A protein has these predicted regions:
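Flexible, solvent-exposed loop/hinge segments and secondary-structure transition points
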Residues: 1-139
Length: 139
């Protein structure tokens, strides 16, 4: 029998709370999504005035980071520069995205989920997501 680690709702809630607190301090509204080990949505938040377009983007960033087992900006780097990787259609999944801001959460050497942020620059999204993912990995 195979077993695997996945983040749970309390992990997801802790990550969301951290992201929302930091974004509030910056006075920058964001959308945040946390996915389980399968890439499926576990928790989600959209701050007031966060762009509606960021809803799907945040969810897709969490999906991509889980399924690709790497930060979404790395997926983007590979598809923007064919010499480093391949076209996004290679993944065969329209939910895959290469915008920064999705970060996998690792437990016991395997991806246990992902945290994603959308609504700011890719760099700011990635920074917030990485800090929240670290809270889950290192409670």
């Amino acid at each position: 029998m195979r077993t695997f680690s996945t983040i749970d709702y309390s992990d997801a809630r802790r990550a969301l709370d951290h992201i929302l607190e930091k974004a509030s301090q910056l006075k920058k509204p964001v959308v945040a999504a946390v996915a389980d080990a399968h890439g499926e949505l576990l928790a989600f938040a959209r701050m007031d005035d966060a762009p509606a377009s960021s809803i799907t983007i945040a969810i897709n960033k969490a999906w991509t980071a889980t399924r690709a087992r790497k930060p979404t900006h790395e997926v983007g780097e590979r598809v923007r520069h064919p010499e480093k990787g391949h076209d996004i259609s290679y993944y065969g999944d329209p939910k895959f995205t290469g915008w920064g801001g999705g970060v996998p959460v690792w437990k016991d050497g395997k991806v246990a989920g992902a945290v994603a942020v959308s609504g700011l620059s890719s760099e700011e999204d990635a920074e917030l997501a990485a800090a929240a993912a670290a809270l889950i990995t290192n409670p």
